[in-house]
Swiss-Prot record:
GO terms for molecular function: GTP binding; GTPase activity; magnesium ion binding. This is GTPase Obg. The lineage of its organism: Bacteria, Pseudomonadati, Pseudomonadota, Gammaproteobacteria, Lysobacterales. GTP binds at residues 166-173, 191-195, 213-216, 293-296, 324-326. Its EC number is 3.6.5.-.
């Protein structure tokens, strides 16, 4: 199934039922008073987070969602039945935006979270409410109120533990295939990955985490160039960023790039850091490890020397790894270290939760 992470829908709440104009008509009571009942309230539209969904693809086929209208009031003070609510299931991680105001009105982060997105109209009053000392037989009733109507933009942010980032063709999809059961498309041209791919990495029988292969970024991504900001947002909820670099991208004797993604390794790092900072500076505060890929394309000693020179030039202090995603060499230690990091993060969060009570 293709991953669809954005959709636009229209939600229409039900109108309230109209109030009724009616009078008692019973034997021996020729001048019965007003007994018109109220209309029922219109149904509302709700979004509910569902852990069993992981895509917005269903909204490509169904875009308009309507709740039921309230039933009109009736005589003998009978109230109209309320309209049935419309429940729309969305994946966990869905951000809800009001298109008219560009305001974020909800963020569905837990299974079962409910968000009211269109409130049903209130039912109208029947004529029994308008009786007074000077108007014993009112012939007026109030119509039901109109239900709310909105156009919503749904954006899905992946709930992954690890986000992989890097320029196109550095080997992200190959890496995720190597460490998980995911099978993203792999080919030797840019933007092979057009949708984020999720892979589950199992370390032990009961230890696992989710890794997201986000489509390749290019210079100007923060401004929407290439696949743009629609995928940068997926990195915001991750616990760890793996910054993949093609270590085989080298220059010839004249200084012209001749191998790899078209950028020297140090440029791959610095240019992508600029894009992250422009999109969301908080991304640079996340744990970020450097993964130097394609070490298999050169002798081992040369790859190690290039890697150490790059780390020194960057003044890199965070963890870094020299790997070959194709042969899987060096990939597994990264996953084990990531699991150790996540366990530590959970322990710290638990301690902070206890101390704040």
């Amino acid at each position: 199934m293709k991953f669809v992470d954005e959709a636009e829908i229209q939600v229409i709440a039900g109108n309230g039922g109209d109030g009724c104009v009616s009078f008692r008509r019973e034997k021996f009571i020729p001048l019965g008073g007003p007994d018109g009942g109220d209309g029922g309230d219109g149904g509302s539209v709700w979004l509910v987070a569902d852990e069993n969904l992981n895509t917005l693809v269903d909204f490509r086929h169904e875009r308009i969602f309507k709740a039921q209208r309230g039933v009109n009031g009736m005589g003998q003070q009978m109230y109209g039945k309320a309209g049935q609510d419309k429940i729309i299931s969305v994946p966990i991680g869905t951000v809800v935006i009001n298109v008219q105001t560009d305001e974020v009105i909800g963020d569905m982060v837990r299974h079962g979270d409910r968000l009211l997105v269109a409130k049903g109209g209130t039912g109208g009053l029947g004529n029994m409410h308008f009786k007074s000392s000077i108007n014993r037989a009112p012939r007026q009733a109030r119509p039901g109120e109109q239900g709310e109507e909105r156009t919503l933009k749904l954006e899905l942010k992946l709930l992954a533990d690890i986000g992989m980032l890097g320029f196109p063709n550095v080997g992200k999809s190959t890496f995720i295939r190597a460490v998980s059961a995911a099978t993203p498309k792999v080919a030797d041209y840019p933007f092979t990955t057009l949708y984020p791919n999720l892979g589950v990495v199992k370390i032990e029988a009961y230890s696992s985490f989710v890794i997201a292969d986000v489509p390749g970024l290019i210079e100007g991504a923060a401004d929407g160039v290439g696949l743009g900001t629609q995928f940068l947002r997926h990195l915001q909820r991750t616990k760890l960023l793996l910054h993949m670099v093609d270590i085989s991208a080298t220059a010839d004797a004249y200084g012209n790039e001749k191998v790899g993604v078209g950028l020297l390794p140090i440029e791959q790092v610095r240019k992508l850091e600029i894009e992250l900072e422009r999109h969301d500076p908080a991304l640079l505060d996340k744990p970020r490890w450097l993964v130097l890929n394609k070490a298999d394309l050169m002798p081992q000693e040369e790859a190690q020397a290039l890697a150490e020179a790059l780390i020194a030039e960057l003044h890199w202090t965070a963890p870094w790894y020299l790997v070959s995603a194709v042969s899987r060499e060096g990939t597994w230690p990264i996953m084990k270290s990531a699991m150790t990091l996540f366990e530590h993060q959970r322990e710290v969060a638990a301690e902070q939760s206890v101390s704040s009570r």
